[in-house]
Amino acid sequence: MTTSLVLNPRWPADTVMFVYENNLDDLNKNMEGLVGSGNFAASQCRNIMAHSAAAAALGGHPSGLVHSSTGYSTVDVTATSSNDTLTSSGKQCATGPCPAATVPHQSSSAATALPYSYFGNGYYPCRMGRGSLKSCTQAAGAALSSQYMDTTVNSDEYSNHRAKEFAFYHSYPSPYQSMASYLDVSVVQTLGAGEPRHDTLLPMDSYQPWALTNGWGGQMYCSKDQGQAGHLWKSALADVVAHQHDGSPFRRGRKKRIPYTKVQLKELEKEYAANKFITKDKRRKISAATNLSERQITIWFQNRRVKEKKFVAKVKSNAP
């Protein structure tokens, strides 16, 4: 079983990761051996683990326990195993010296924190003194640090590094400055004196800060009315129609009716008197003579037949 433990002390120090290659029975035997050695009482730090296997696994040199008379911080860790999951609050050590395992790590000049660690089948709590860590320069420690971690962050930047991971949660206070919004500045600048001022298609003044209750450092901008897009498009189209009615040449709709000349009407009436349904050859001939398109000639013949039909129906209705 591989057991990992990450200790983050409350003072500026390197974060330490313990890796133990023992099962639960071996750990209990090692703890009983530590109690029987006479260095400390059985009531002190019963959950501390043996360091011999960790030193061998990390490539460090095994050494004895180091006593410390200074105060130490408590690390409460959840204890888990491969078969069951236990929750341990961490037994409190009595006031006084508390031994801690010697862990090999890099020197102070190249000290690296271990924000991420490899968690095995077991996880146990213990308490350590501030000065109980012994420094030694081992190359294997750096190799295993890169193996059991994703990124390398300095110890003084560890809190800020962890804060970045929770910066986007509402309940986590952000230690960073608020970012400038993309919608802070209006798009339309001041116009000249002679230029007419028109409203923008997408006005930016409709965005207001969205205050978060649980405390983000920055501000988010959202529209007051989410259903405003349709209104904007309708107003824009209405503006275009208004400009068209003002006399603009770019006016949509039906083409302006151009009346036929007397020469064109004479030629069309002559052909209609001969045949009410014009043929293809006749249509091409009249088109060349009157400078009209074949489609115009076809439509004129259709309208002329309808006009005659209405006239005949009106005459019949007026007859006694």
Curated annotation (Swiss-Prot):
Q: Which GO terms describe its molecular function?
A: DNA binding; DNA-binding transcription factor activity, RNA polymerase II-specific
Where is this protein chiefly located? nucleus
- One Pfam family of this chain: Homeodomain
What Gene Ontology cellular-component terms does the record carry? nucleus
Keywords tagged on the record: Developmental protein, DNA-binding, Homeobox, Nucleus, Transcription, Transcription regulation
| UniProt subcellular location | Nucleus
Q: Where in the chain is the DNA-binding region found?
A: 253-312
> What protein family does this chain belong to?
Belongs to the Abd-B homeobox family.
Function recorded in the entry = Sequence-specific transcription factor which is part of a developmental regulatory system that provides cells with specific positional identities on the anterior-posterior axis.
Q: What is this protein called?
A: Homeobox protein Hox-B13a
State the organism of origin: Takifugu rubripes
